[in-house]
């Protein structure tokens, strides 16, 4: 939902699972990553791939874990557009780039998914440009043509790439509204429902929306002794150091029948060794 809430770390896990060989529990595929936030860390991704590869016995002929990791990394295609317009152009060029065997090593692999981290990167600049265009259009002397909506173009480009490559799109975004705090009167999110912050048509673009956040640590009670507060603080610090996160379905705009099928979530830990998944929970 916000920077540091585990979204990119969860993407590392998904990417590692996608590019590892099937003999090690992976999908032996390729991934395209549009890193508009510039937050992707190759050493961290490498660490996650090594961690997953090391959890399964190395089959004969697979080579060492380091060799397997290096081979898997060659199938992660990281692109870093610097503006909304360049992101649109990059998304439009994906089919041409990936279907040319001379461009990369993944021609014989299918694309597991296209990732965009994050769709919110250019939100404020887009909003400022939109407001400026509206202001200019409202002046009598302005004869400029309205500019195409960048977010509409990006949504269309990603959908076209998804269809052409037979690959789903995974995108992250930030929650730009108020943050839930049950201790503050006047605002509280109901259940697991968060209204999407991105402009149209992005509210209706995803088939499934997930909320990822650090597992909340309850606040200290008001009536508590100093000794109890010290012990409680130590326990709270241990919980924070675990790097525990939770992921659950965003119920905004989802009908009840679909919710009954999807009402579950999972927890994961972000550690120095990488992301460790917990079992699914109801």
Segments from the language model and where they lie:
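N-terminal regions of ATP-driven nucleic-acid and macromolecular assemblies
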Residues: 1-282
């Amino acid at each position: 939902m916000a920077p540091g809430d585990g979204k990119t770390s969860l993407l590392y896990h998904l990417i590692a699972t996608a590019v590892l060989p099937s003999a090690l529990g992976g999908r032996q595929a390729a991934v395209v990553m549009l890193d508009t936030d510039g937050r992707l860390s190759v050493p961290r991704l490498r660490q996650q791939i090594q961690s997953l590869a090391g959890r399964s016995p190395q089959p004969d002929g697979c080579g060492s874990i380091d060799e397997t990791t290096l081979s898997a990394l060659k199938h992660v295609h990281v692109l870093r557009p610097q503006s909304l317009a360049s992101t649109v152009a990059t998304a439009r060029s994906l089919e041409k780039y990936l279907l040319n065997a001379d461009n990369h090593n993944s021609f014989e692999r299918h694309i597991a998914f296209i990732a965009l981290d994050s769709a919110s990167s250019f939100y404020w600049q887009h909003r400022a440009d939109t407001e400026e265009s509206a202001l200019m259009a409202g002046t009598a002397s302005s004869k400029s043509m309205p500019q195409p909506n960048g977010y509409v173009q990006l949504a269309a480009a990603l959908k076209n790439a998804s269809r052409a490559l037979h690959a789903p799109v995974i995108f992250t975004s930030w929650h730009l509204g108020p943050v839930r705090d049950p201790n503050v009167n006047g605002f509280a999110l109901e259940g697991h429902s968060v209204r999407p912050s991105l402009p149209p048509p992005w509210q209706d673009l995803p088939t499934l929306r997930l909320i990822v956040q650090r597992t909340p640590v309850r606040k200290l009670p008001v009536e508590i002794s100093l000794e109890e507060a010290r012990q409680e603080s130590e326990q709270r610090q241990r919980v924070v150091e675990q790097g525990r996160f939770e992921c659950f379905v965003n119920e905004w705009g989802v009908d009840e029948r679909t919710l009954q099928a999807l009402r579950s979530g999972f927890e994961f830990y972000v550690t120095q060794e990488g992301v460790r998944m917990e079992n699914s929970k109801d």
